[in-house]
């Protein structure tokens, strides 16, 4: 058994699904890991937009959104856990404090309270954010086991991929951080 100091912390990393990903929920996905510890991991899928946009979601929760550039931003499928709950991955806002925020190593924050959406609606919230419904979760040791079985590649996250890259390009862009493309990947693992 490894000592806690030997553990690799994958917080602020991308998980990139390998071609042999057994779970169709995660096939072709890039997951931003918000938290990884000996208790498990929590992440958000960043490349699966839904057919819901911000205007529709804000109407559902009785918030008025009149900022034209934001109306048609998609809400993302963040993962299969708590799919009715919103998770906002965003850059910190100087002087702002939200009711339920978690700072992520690397400078981003994840907020689950409605006050961040209220701030977005009034133009005082984060300028760069990604809103998901649901999240991905792993129990203690589960993610490490999936990585060992060649289910995921990992690489340090780049906020430009989260916020500035079109959703359909995020998978290839994340692979590009490793110097590879999807055409170079194989679902087979082996040892030399």
UniProtKB/Swiss-Prot annotation:
Transmembrane segments: none annotated. GO terms for cellular component: cytosol. It comes from the Bacteria. NCBIfam families: PRK00228.1-1, PRK00228.1-2. Belongs to the UPF0301 (AlgH) family. This is UPF0301 protein Bcen2424_0864. It comes from Burkholderia cenocepacia (strain HI2424). The lineage of its organism: Bacteria, Pseudomonadati, Pseudomonadota, Betaproteobacteria, Burkholderiales.
């Amino acid at each position: 058994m490894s000592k806690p100091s030997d553990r690799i912390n994958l917080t602020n990393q991308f998980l990139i699904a390998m071609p042999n990903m057994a779970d169709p929920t995660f096939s072709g996905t890039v997951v931003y890991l918000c938290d990884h510890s000996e208790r498990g991991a929590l992440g958000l899928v960043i490349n699966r937009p839904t057919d819901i946009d911000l205007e529709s979601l804000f109407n559902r929760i009785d918030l008025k959104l009149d900022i034209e550039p934001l109306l048609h931003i998609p809400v993302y499928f963040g993962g299969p856990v708590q799919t009715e709950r919103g998770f906002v991955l965003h850059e910190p806002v100087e002087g702002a404090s939200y009711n339920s925020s978690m700072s992520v190593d690397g400078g981003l924050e994840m907020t689950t309270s409605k006050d961040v959406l209220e701030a977005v609606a009034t133009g005082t919230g984060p300028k760069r954010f990604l809103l998901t419904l649901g999240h991905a979760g792993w129990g203690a040791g589960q993610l490490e086991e999936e990585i060992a079985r060649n289910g995921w590649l990992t690489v340090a996250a780049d906020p430009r991929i989260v916020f500035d890259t079109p959703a359909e390009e995020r998978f290839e862009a994340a692979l590009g951080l490793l110097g590879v493309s999807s055409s170079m990947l194989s679902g087979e693992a082996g040892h030399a």
